[in-house]
Amino acid sequence: MKKTDTIIIGAGPVGLFAVHQLGIKGLKSIVIDNLDKAGGQCIELYPDKPIYDIPAVPECTGEELTKKLLEQIKPFNTEFFLNERVEEVKQDKENWIVKTNNKNEFLAPNIIIAGGVGSFEPRKLSVKEAENFEGTSLFYAVRNKEQ
């Protein structure tokens, strides 16, 4: 079981900003996210889309925002557990216990749920044998806009 000061569920912009704010106060955190990389929807669904509602930043893309947030939290040496889905959250007398689908268990007195709109998955084609083409000629997300 991994122990920390705060467990953050969600590695999107809010989860990453929470790491920063906790780090400033000297608190360590662990971040858990269902996606394979930090950034949430900003990086997964619209990395090139302009974002206009960040205070003091007139415009940036989802990818730029994610890169800046990750750069900002580097000094705090945060441990990320990506490709992990939270299966159970329970509280004992003084701590939260979080269990994931990868059988990892985390213990902390504080928890932040920064899941945005929640875990999302593509609506896959209901075509026979479509899964045989996933990742080669059938894609559900843009991973490289140059391809």
For each predicted feature, which ranges?
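FAD-binding core/adjacent interface of flavoenzyme oxidoreductases
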Residues: 1-9, 25, 80-147
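Glycine-rich FAD pyrophosphate-binding loop
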Residues: 7-9, 23-45
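Glycine-rich Rossmann-fold phosphate-binding loop(s) that bind the pyrophosphate
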Residues: 10-14
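Short, glycine/charged-enriched secondary-structure capping and boundary segments
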Residues: 22, 44-48, 125-129
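Short, acidic/turn-prone active-site loops that include or flank metal/cofactor-
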Residues: 36, 59, 143
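Alpha/beta-hydrolase active-site loop signature
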Residues: 36, 49, 119
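N-terminal Rossmann-like dinucleotide/flavin-binding domain of flavoprotein oxidoreductases
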Residues: 43-105
